[in-house]
Structure formats: structure tokens, C-alpha cells
């Protein structure tokens, strides 16, 4: 029976894999800019890597907004390099009880600006053309690559977005020369290790920020993070005042910043936390602790909390876009889809994430009106405000 069952499962898996196209395009960004993607390897010579005598190396993706008139040619490129796609597919297969579609990540593509007019430099004039730089820290044990569509969508609204991998934390980091560092060292079943790994992310963030500011020393800086990356946002803002504003996408908080909060500097640092499904500060002790600390220590500091009751934790990732563009919602099955991404279509979630992120950073980095952050909008009923 075991052999027969294995054969049947293999046949089903092969049928499912053959049902997806050899490649499919993730949603094209809806903003006014085309987007260029640069894959960069950065070496921090001032730090040793974890349990190593070698300097710490990072991989980042930099998404640059390019005015349409300066983009000569677009190209559809793989979202994931081969080894990353293979490992992440295997992890998703195991986590979903076999309901994930093998080969889905390898088949995904994003459309990028592949050729920019000569003379247009993305980091010229020392201020990145007045375009803010947003740093993005991914979820725990999660590659930056599963935020490519979200980063590209935000970038298309007029932001340089830099997504970061955190080696030994991230499931897999694939370097330009083919070197691979696998992760999984951040164990959420052992909370005592999380402040350490949170601090590693903060150090990575400060290093990447320093590199970005070498060519754009006057650029305005913000930060976003999902899940464990959301904790890195708060801690990085407390550590480095150059980060003027930040958004935490559905992440629990770790480290001393929870008890100090933001608002102790002369320069304001607006902070937005955005939960999904039932997650909010009334059921997350770390969020509540931060809120009370800021109300006590910095009562005038700008902070707000949003929610997406119909969303899921992975609404703030590319999983909805990958599933919808790959046409596999029905293949994966309603029960698994409900847990993984919920019912909100990717096109819709990408749109409201983009516009709320845009209004927040226009307000916090440029002093414009709060826009959608003023309160509930009939145009985006999925997004709720918590008192």
C-alpha cells in the first residue's frame, strides 16, 4: 500500500506540475514609473560573519524607479535563481502538507526595465533624484526574493526599494559566484535567541544604509519589514535616526526598542504597524507594550495601527501574486489557500498596500497631508483603523 500510494502521489504531483506554464509573469506595477532591478552583493569588512572568521556578506535587490521616457527596454526575468527556487519550493511543499505546486517559484517572472537611457543615473545629484530610499527586511527564515513583486510595486510609485537577505537567518542566500549559505538558525520555538538575531538584522540594516548613502548622501530614508523584519524596522529606527519613518507589516517585536519606543529624537520618526487577520495590539503583548511605552514616554509621537481582517500574514508577501499569476488557487485547494493567503486577490492587495505605503511615506518623509492615513476609506474597505 505504501508503494502504491507513493506512486499515486507522484503521478498527482507530476500532473499538478505540468498544469502550470513553463513561465508566468507576476503583476506589472501600476505606478507611473518603470522599475529597474539590480542584484548586488555587499561585504561588510567591519564585521565577521556568524561563527566565522570571514567578513559578513549580504545579498540585496535594489529596485529603482525609472521615468518611462528614460526606460528604453523592458525584459521578463526570473524572480528566483535556481537553487533558491528549488529549496523554497521544497520548504513550501513540506509546510503545506504537499499542497504547494512544485516548480511554481522557478516559473515566476517579473518585468523590469533592462536598459536605461545613457546619462540617466539612478543615484545622481547626491539625493537619488529626490527619490526616497526604502529598506526592506523580510520575514524570519524568509528570502528577500518572495517580496520582489511588492517591492517593485512600491518602487513604481516613486521609491528606491532595497530588499535585504540576512544570512544564517534567511532560508537560503545565493551569492553571485554561486556560493550558498543556508539558514534556519532563527528558531521561533526558542524566543530567547530572537533578540540576538533581531540585533543582527539591525546591524545589517545600518550597513546597507551606509552603502546606499555613499552615492546618495542626501536621500530621504524609510524602512519596511514583514514579520520578524517588522521588529527590525522598529529596532533599526531606534538605533539609527537617519531612518525617518517605518512600517511594520504584521511582525511581533523583540529587543529593547519595545520598551523605549520612538519619539526621543528632535526629528520625528512616524511609525505605522499593520496587522493581518486577527493580529493587533490587543492580542500581541509586544505591540501593546510598545504602544503603552510610547504613550507614556513620547505622547506626541506619530503612530497608527491598521488591520486587514480578511488578509493573512502572507498578504504582505508575493505569495498571493505568485499563486494568482500561476493560476493555482484551485489546484492548491481552498483550505490551504485560506491559511496561506486568504481570499483577497493579489491585484487588490498589491494596490492597497502600494497606496497606503505611498501616502505614509509622502507624509512622513516630505511633510505632505496624511492622505489615506487620516482614517477609514470607502475605496479600501479591507483596511481598518484601530483606536
Swiss-Prot record:
Lipid metabolism as a keyword?
Answer: yes
Positions of glycan attachment = 51, 141, 283
Transmembrane residues, as ranges? none
Q: Which Gene3D superfamilies match?
A: alpha/beta hydrolase
Q: Does the keyword field hold Cell cycle?
A: no
Q: Which InterPro entries match?
A: AB_hydrolase_fold
Q: What are the positions of the active site?
A: 227, 250, 313
Signal peptide from the UniProt entry? 1-17
Q: Where in the cell is it found?
A: Secreted
Q: Which domain of life is it from?
A: Eukaryota
The EC number(s) attached to this protein equal 3.1.1.47
GO BP field: lipid catabolic process
Q: Which UniProt keywords apply?
A: Glycoprotein, Hydrolase, Lipid degradation, Lipid metabolism, Secreted, Signal
GO CC annotations?
extracellular region
Per the record, the major location class is secreted
A GO MF annotation of the entry reads: 1-alkyl-2-acetylglycerophosphocholine esterase activity
Spell out the family assignment given in the record's similarity comment: Belongs to the AB hydrolase superfamily. Lipase family.
**PANTHER family from the entry?**
PAF ACETYLHYDROLASE FAMILY PROTEIN, PLATELET-ACTIVATING FACTOR ACETYLHYDROLASE
What is this protein called in UniProt? Answer: Probable 1-alkyl-2-acetylglycerophosphocholine esterase
